[in-house]
Amino acid sequence: MRTNVGEDFARALASKDSARMRELFADQIDFQALTPGRHWQASTPEKAVDDIILGVWFGPQDDIHELRSVTCGQVRDRERVTYRLGVKRNNTEYVVEQHAYYESDGTHITWIRILCSGYRPESME
């Protein structure tokens, strides 16, 4: 079964595969994202992956233990991927969902906008 670049990105993120994520981004990428309380920008794969995605959002202390869902689609000429992750941080279970709209050359993501739900507690007790 062939996956698209967006699904490949979601799977690489879920496994925290930094090399694969950098490989999926074009050398010059227009990366912007919105998380609760902050706007992020990067123009290189290293900045986007190492400094932002795996440097802050899902750092070494965060265990992404499950890719709960991934869906892909298109909005005219723009691709879309939505993924939901199960993450353990500081001994607490969370759900994190992100929606990404992106453009690619078929192999590399050249433009991406990500919107993140933030870390939502698994249990609302």
What is the predicted function of each stretch?
Residues 12, 32, 87-88:
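Alpha-helix C-capping/helix-to-loop hinge sites
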Residues 6, 13, 25, 49-53, ...:
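Hydrophobic alpha-helical core bundles mediating ligand binding, dimerization, or RNAP-core interactions
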Residues 53-125:
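A beta-strand edge to alpha-helix "cap/lid" segment located at domain peripheries
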Residues 20, 26-76:
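A solvent-exposed, acidic/Ser-Thr-rich amphipathic alpha-helical stretch
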Residues 1, 38-46, 95-100:
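Charged, low-complexity, helix/coiled-coil-prone segments
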Residues 9, 21-22, 29, 48-49, ...:
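Hydrophobic pocket/interface hotspot
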Residues 1-28:
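Short acidic-aromatic low-complexity motifs
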Residues 3-13, 38-39, 54-58, 111:
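Short, mixed-charge, low-aromatic patches
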